[in-house]
């Protein structure tokens, strides 16, 4: 049994938090936590329904007080003091529930979900787009001989990644010249360097940033990474975290190079990762997206994802107030 620190903080676990979650929103937040689990998770008897997250200031998601209940506790001085001792120059934050925004809201984060049984199959078109949505042409279904093989059934294995040609129709306008290669989708358990570097760049600029980024990206019980490359250059990456919490898999780290956007790249990666999630036993897919990222929201909606709830990062009251 863990011993509390002198100021009363006690290490906690994802399972303990799940056992104490009071509603569907809290349970989904625990699944999101399992997908992006920091090195330090602490609970305090005087802050019921809260968990203090710390990962050396790398991302707000891993360095804020997660409030699982419907409201912020009346006093959060204990958390403010804890963060102030470790990061005095950084304003401590709490992540709290908020009403679903009615439009673009720079401070809100939307949590979107879907039932994987209803998710479009890899390569399946997703229907007409609304005129106000960014035009992203879905990829047609690949031929059976080129479909990617399934990843290993155990998320803890280090299987050999699989590779498949991405359908060239929406991505390769014009004739193919000598030596020109179309984009290829690569799925596997190996962490893409591009994703590691992009995450490490969100640290404090110290030599430990790469190791801390790797710890976050490999923290879930299982991960599947998607990489799209073209001409020897990575033009898209995404991560699927198999959380082991209520059959939820979490999608994050979706990035597409500017020159490859609006060509179906993100949708193609997401469909294939959703297929892997189902194969690994997940029944639900969840993700977080900032409420003012209208292009990403439109892409996820076309794939059948809907709003579940919203949260926002709220500054904690200064210590002593």
Name these PLM-found stretches.
Residues 1-86:
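N-terminal charged segments
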Residues 37-43, 87-90, 107-109, 216-226, ...:
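A short helix-loop-beta-strand connector motif used in the catalytic cores of GNAT acetyltransferases and
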Residues 58-64, 242-251, 261:
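A conserved beta-turn-beta hairpin within the catalytic core of GNAT-like acetyltransferases
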Residues 68-138, 142, 152, 164, ...:
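Acyl-donor-binding surface of acyltransferase catalytic domains
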Residues 73-80, 253-256, 262-275, 279, ...:
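Conserved acetyl-CoA-binding loop-helix of GNAT-fold acetyltransferases
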Residues 86-96, 277-288:
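Conserved GNAT acetyl-CoA-binding A-motif
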Residues 98-107, 267, 291-310, 317:
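Conserved active-site alpha-helix within GNAT-family acetyltransferase domains
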Residues 215-231, 235-255:
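A conserved beta-strand-loop-helix scaffold within acyl/acetyltransferase catalytic domains
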């Amino acid at each position: 049994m863990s011993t509390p620190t002198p100021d009363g903080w006690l290490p906690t676990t994802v399972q303990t938090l799940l056992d104490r979650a009071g509603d569907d929103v809290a349970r989904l937040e625990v699944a999101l936590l399992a997908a992006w689990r920091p090195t330090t998770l602490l609970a305090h008897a005087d802050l019921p329904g809260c968990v203090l997250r710390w990962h050396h200031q790398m991302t707000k998601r891993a360095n804020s007080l997660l409030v699982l209940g419907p409201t912020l506790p009346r006093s959060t001085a204990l958390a403010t003091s804890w963060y102030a001792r470790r990061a005095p120059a950084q304003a401590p934050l709490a992540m709290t529930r908020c009403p679903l925004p009615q439009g673009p809201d720079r401070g809100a984060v939307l949590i979107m979900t879907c039932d994987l049984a209803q998710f479009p199959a890899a390569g399946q078109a997703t229907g007409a787009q609304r005129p106000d949505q960014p035009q992203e042409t879905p990829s047609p279904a690949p031929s059976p001989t080129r479909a990617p093989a399934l990843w290993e059934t155990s998320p803890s294995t280090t299987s050999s990644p699989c590779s498949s040609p991405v359908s060239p129709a929406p991505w390769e306008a014009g004739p193919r010249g000598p030596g020109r290669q179309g984009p290829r989708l690569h799925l596997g358990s190996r962490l893409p360097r591009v994703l590691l570097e992009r995450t490490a760049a969100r640290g404090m600029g110290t030599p430990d940033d790469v190791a801390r980024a790797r710890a976050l990206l490999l923290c879930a019980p299982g991960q599947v990474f998607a990489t799209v490359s073209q001409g020897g250059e990575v033009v898209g990456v995404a991560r699927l975290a198999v959380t082991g919490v209520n059959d939820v898999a979490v999608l994050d780290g979706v990035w597409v190079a500017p020159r490859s956007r609006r060509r179906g790249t993100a949708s193609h990666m997401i469909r294939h990762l959703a297929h892997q999630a189902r194969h690994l036993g997940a029944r639900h897919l969840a993700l977080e997206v900032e409420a003012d990222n209208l292009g990403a929201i439109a892409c996820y909606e076309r794939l059948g994802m809907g709003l579940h709830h919203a949260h926002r990062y709220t500054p904690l009251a200064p210590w002593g107030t």
